[in-house]
Curated annotation (Swiss-Prot):
Subcellular location: Cytoplasm; Mitochondrion
Keyword annotations from UniProtKB, A to Z: Cytoplasm, Disulfide bond, FAD, Flavoprotein, Mitochondrion, NADP, Oxidoreductase, Redox-active center
Recorded catalytic activity of this chain's protein: 2 glutathione + NADP(+) = glutathione disulfide + NADPH + H(+)
Family: Belongs to the class-I pyridine nucleotide-disulfide oxidoreductase family.
Disulfide bond listed as a keyword: yes
Description of how the protein assembles with itself and partners: Homodimer.
GO molecular function: flavin adenine dinucleotide binding; glutathione-disulfide reductase (NADPH) activity; NADP binding
Name of the protein this chain belongs to: Glutathione reductase
Cofactor binding, note field: Binds 1 FAD per subunit.
Domain of life: Eukaryota
Record-listed E.C. numbers: 1.8.1.7
UniProt GO BP: cell redox homeostasis; cellular response to oxidative stress; glutathione metabolic process
Main location per the UniProt record: cytoplasm
Length: 490
């Protein structure tokens, strides 16, 4: 068989059209680099975040949040009843159509931004073809590629080969289900959540991480009978215990999610009564629901011929990189979810831009440019929201020693709930500031309560700059707000 011949050589080949890949491609092109971006999902530029992640999830969260607020109206004299949203009140299918149309508009915006920056892009599966790093692309749909040949339509499954001086692997990840569970295929993943054509009357969500917490909160707020199956006693076990306990208790005691603790996970799934599912748990408990959602994590998309170019993986089967995003191959780089460091959209964007600054700007000021992965803020769009930056209380004690740590905590009902006599309507506000050393440097901040995502952004800047508790105290509070508690704690 004759060796493959590249039809065009680029300065930069970017494999993956998610947030990190697009950001790096555009930044490289802004410096004059000749860039080709390859995205496997046909006409779905933007990656997980735009298509099956943070963007459509946040739209669904807004719907759930409004549903929760509906039964607050009576307390403010705007309704004569305080009925909660019931199954059937929410027009799932119409809302899905609107949400999907919004995502489609974003796909188009991503494409236009690439064109405006002079980035060539193609829809197809990329695979390293040889040890030189040439990339073979199998097209995933019929498409015009005017940068190759004006007016010609290239056909689905056609193969094209490209060469690049530098290559970026930004392939992201995919949602998993447990293959060893009998009947696992009867459930869907968090990706499949966005494909549901109708709202399930009852649903089981399996997994205690932020995706499971967010989706179960949305389902319950919109009126579905909701079961959250977890192996331990709390949700969000990778977060500070204050967040774990606050969200677990609120979901159980007030929101009405049936959290099944110490479940032993799922041992078997069977189909019953049409499309309903019978779920047998490891602890012997049995659930019968309309829908099963697996939220048990994601794996890196690595099946692209990495062995041919000497790119190595870590023990979690994620692409191994150094602090400069460089793989074991000096001409191949990687970032985003596929490396598994901090799997957040803004992190991938920041890493991608810094990488292109270093590789293509020609500016010595950027020759050591790389992303600092510490003190990255993250939020959970639960009901209520939660946010975190820095070290948990446990992590801080392990790093600095227990005698060097001081904790400031506050738990209260936000002023918004003052008009409500029924305690079941009130969601908690819980704040924790973790400080280390004699100067009480703030090394962790963990908050639960309404608007936590918006509140955390500004405090994230302060903590990234090395703020101390004294700095917090010296800030004049904005009154009346919940956030003022963070600068008035004693």
């Amino acid at each position: 068989m004759a060796p493959l011949q590249a039809i065009r050589k680029y300065d930069y080949l970017v494999i993956g059209g998610g947030s990190g890949g697009v950001a790096s491609a555009r930044r490289a092109a802004s410096y004059g680099a000749k860039v080709l971006l390859i995205e496997s999902k046909f006409n779905k530029m933007g990656g997980t975040c735009v298509n099956v992640g943070c963007v459509p999830k946040k739209v669904m969260w807004y719907a759930g949040d409004l549903a929760e607020k509906r039964h607050h109206l009576k307390s403010y004299g705007l309704s004569t009843t305080d009925d909660k949203v019931k199954y059937g009140d929410f027009d799932w299918s119409t809302f899905k159509d609107k949400r999907d149309a919004y995502v489609k508009r974003l796909n188009g915006i991503y494409e236009r931004n690439l064109k405006n920056e002079g980035v060539d892009y193609i829809y197809g599966f990329a695979h390293f073809a040889n040890s030189n790093g040439d990339v073979e692309v199998t097209l995933t749909g019929d498409q015009e590629l005017s940068f190759l040949e004006e007016g010609k339509e290239f056909k689905k499954d056609e193969k094209l080969v490209f060469a690049g001086s530098k290559t970026l692997i930004a392939t992201g990840g995919y949602a998993i289900n447990p293959p060893n569970v009998e009947g696992h295929e009867l459930g869907t993943t968090s990706d499949g959540f966005f494909e549901l054509q109708k709202q399930p009357k009852s649903v089981a969500v399996v997994g205690a991480g932020y995706i499971g917490v967010e989706l179960s909160g949305i389902f319950k707020a919109l009126g579905s009978e909701t079961h959250l199956v977890i192996r331990g006693d709390t949700v969000l076990r990778s977060f500070d215990e204050s967040i774990q306990n606050s969200i677990t208790d609120y979901y159980t005691d007030k929101l009405g999610v049936n959290i099944i603790k110490q479940s032993g996970s799922v041992s078997k799934v069977e189909k019953i009564d049409g499309d309903r599912k019978k779920i047998t748990l490891g602890n012997g408990q049995v659930l019968e629901v309309d829908e099963l959602i697996w939220t048990m994590g994601r794996k890196s998309l690595i099946n692209i011929g990495l062995d041919k170019v000497g790119v190595t993986l870590n023990d979690k089967q994620q692409v191994d990189v150094d602090q400069f995003q460089q793989t074991a191959n000096p001409n191949i780089f990687s970032l985003g979810d596929v490396i598994g460091k901090v799997e957040l959209t803004p992190v991938a964007i920041a890493a991608g831009r810094r990488l292109s600054n270093r590789l293509f700007s020609g500016d010595k000021a950027f020759e050591n440019d790389h992303l600092d992965y510490s003190n990255v803020p993250s939020v959970i769009f639960s009901h209520p929201e939660a946010g975190s930056i820095g070290l948990s209380c446990k992590e801080a004690k392990e790093k600095y020693g227990e005698d060097q740590i001081k904790i400031y905590k506050s738990k209260f009902n936000a002023m918004y709930y003052a008009m409500m006599e029924d305690d079941s309507l009130k969601s908690p506000t819980s704040y924790k500031v973790v400080c280390a050393g004699e100067d009480e440097k703030v090394v962790g901040l963990h908050i639960v309560g309404d608007s936590s995502a918006e509140i955390l952004q500004g405090f994230g800047v302060a903590i990234k700059m090395g703020a101390t508790k004294k700095d917090f105290d010296s800030c004049v509070a904005i009154h009346p707000t919940s956030a003022e508690e963070l600068v008035t704690m004693k």
